[in-house]
């Protein structure tokens, strides 16, 4: 039975409490919610639909696929008014997901039937993609492969961590692009090529898919999946708004990562978000960084550091520097010493997150020894640099950072004849 889900709407997110798990009490649902067909409310167009459609504002018409997921409450209110409804109907716009063969189930919320019908006739739809494949690692990490409406595939990862009190923190690692154009030398994602930017709803739906798979609300979101978020900033910011305002994930629970794209850190700072900026540094000097990150040639290290300092001054939010440790390349104590000197030169509002390299097929890089990792961290700490070592998660699922690629990404377009993964094939960790 299809899961009935609401479009991002803050009043209803609050009304339902645990946002991803609740359906009306009179409706039962099975675990087959992960086998959703593309969520659509489209019905055959009639002559009346064109008039309803033409009344939409240019701002909403720019959403060429007419997707409701990710629209702000103000956009939904505007849409309701343009369809002759009251403002409140925009806020109350609960759109029904369809099951296979277009079977529909109604949730007990007062949305006028006429409004739903007009939306259907005008071609509006929810905007959810089916899960094409799912892999679960021994540590409970789950990688989902979502099939977009243009048959392209994106990956998102759910990372569960249980604290000492037994509470679970669930982090969704989301993609911002289909593939990545930057081709960092140690990263698997760039080897699969680049197709296009993701739309806002295609980012938001990744979080919803993780919630549905784990049957648990997502507590943290990191833009560290496929792609460079700063090259798709408009969609990332719109998705950020939806995740924060509508799905109610705190801004401080959201991290936006970048390898460094000129002028974009300044632009992000101007929005004064309270989210963490994570900069993929990977080297303590420009020469070594260019060897590891080819795109660094267009964005000198000093310029990045200045922009990071300005980001802190603008937002009062500490910057996190991601540093992938590559054995024999950038993992020596001398590199740690040089990194500490660099950071002290530009201020102290920084944190270094060390990431031992995750081996990928065809790469010449090696994972550093535990001793090398410990020595690097100790060298930073002795120089009063705040440091953490990222726990490697999901190696079996090829889901750890730098591993967002599998056999499907080598041929990113899925044939129409390919079947979406069935319920029985999906491994779920609760």
Descriptions of predicted regions:
Residues 2-154, 160, 168, 309-317, ...:
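Auxiliary Fe-S-binding modules of radical SAM enzymes
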Residues 76-79, 203, 236, 304:
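Hydrophobic/aromatic residues in well-formed alpha-helices
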Residues 134-137, 175-176, 257, 280:
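Short linear Ser/Thr-Pro motifs
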Residues 142, 154, 169-174, 182, ...:
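Generic beta-strand structural signal
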Residues 158-159, 235:
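Residue-level structural signal for beta-strand termini and adjacent loop
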Residues 162-202:
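Canonical Radical SAM [4Fe-4S] cluster-binding loop centered on the CxxxCxxC motif
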Residues 191-220:
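Conserved alpha-helical substructure of the radical SAM core
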Residues 211-383, 388:
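Conserved AdoMet/S-adenosylmethionine-binding subsite of the radical SAM
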